[in-house]
Amino acid sequence: MMTQMKTSSDEMKVAIIANGKPQSRRVASKLFNAFRDDPDFYLTKKNPDVLISIGGDGMLLSAFHMYEKELARVRFVGIHTGHLGFYTDYLDSEVDQLIETLRKDSGAKISYPLLNVKLTLADGRSFTSIALNEAAIKRNEKTMAADVCLNDVLFESFRGDGLSVSTPTGSTAYNKSLGGAVLHPTIEALQLTEIASLNNRVYRTLGSPLIVPKHEKITVYPTRMGSYTLSVDNKTYINRNVKKVEFSIDQRKISFVASASHTSFWERVRESFIGDMEE
């Protein structure tokens, strides 16, 4: 979804975050030098208007979680110091183009939905996280057994290695490797994908990815005690005595700087997984 923000004569607050690769540091240095003495920009990591992530998709994921409490304000833009990444609009050779884009910026943004994850333990404690890509729950010993509910109504009793829930943009990540569908981000929905489910005469699950619309909730109730791993993007949590994990579309969204260089979703998919097709 693309929206237009109100323009302002104030200087743009810009934060720059880079991974440790030499090329990323060189790009960051070029941006610092360009912005440092420019009256249109103010370099700060506190309450930025625009966050520039330099590296790859992993770096942008880390930057997203660093600023997840400021999503209403900040817009992201990615520079990939290598080949084109899924969340990046600019290559390291296009720094001057990015600077010019920000100089002419009108505040326009493109927004994508996020995943809300709520973990509740048997003692009543609960913890909430958000994900840009996906979350997955697995049992650390033996097979995971869990009841899966949709809007608090039992849908299936699952047996297998685990379950993954992805956002539309995350549908191209771990979800795709599990055989899930690629979902366009304008479709505000979640995708539930099974991880090595057991299907035989005793245990039966749907065995297919499930698309759940925006206002519905997925709840997973583990039916066996033990240690469970809950991964949320690039973060991992290990807990015992998990009562339930709830997945839903978050009220917040991640926003990217909208420009002529913002690659369309299907073009990103083609470039990431298919590449140029020879005639």
From Swiss-Prot:
It comes from the Bacteria. Its cofactor is a divalent metal cation. Its EC number is 2.7.1.23. GO terms for cellular component: cytoplasm. It is an enzyme of class 2 (transferase). Keywords: ATP-binding, Cytoplasm, Kinase, NAD, NADP, Nucleotide-binding, Transferase. It is found in: Cytoplasm. It catalyses: NAD(+) + ATP = ADP + NADP(+) + H(+). GO terms for biological process: NAD metabolic process; NADP biosynthetic process. Gene3D superfamilies: Probable inorganic polyphosphate/atp-NAD kinase, domain 1, Probable inorganic polyphosphate/atp-NAD kinase, domain 2. One of its GO terms (molecular function) is ATP binding. The active site is at D57 (proton acceptor). NAD(+) binds at D57, G58, N133, E134, R159, D161, T172, A173, Y174, N175, K176, S177, A196. InterPro entries: ATP-NAD_kinase_N, ATP-NAD_kinase_PpnK-typ_C, NAD/diacylglycerol_kinase_sf, NADK. Involved in the regulation of the intracellular balance of NAD and NADP, and is a key enzyme in the biosynthesis of NADP. Catalyzes specifically the phosphorylation on 2'-hydroxyl of the adenosine moiety of NAD to yield NADP. NCBIfam families: PRK04885.1. PANTHER family: NAD KINASE. HAMAP family: NAD_kinase. Belongs to the NAD kinase family. This is NAD kinase. It comes from Streptococcus thermophilus (strain ATCC BAA-250 / LMG 18311). The lineage of its organism: Bacteria, Bacillati, Bacillota, Bacilli, Lactobacillales.
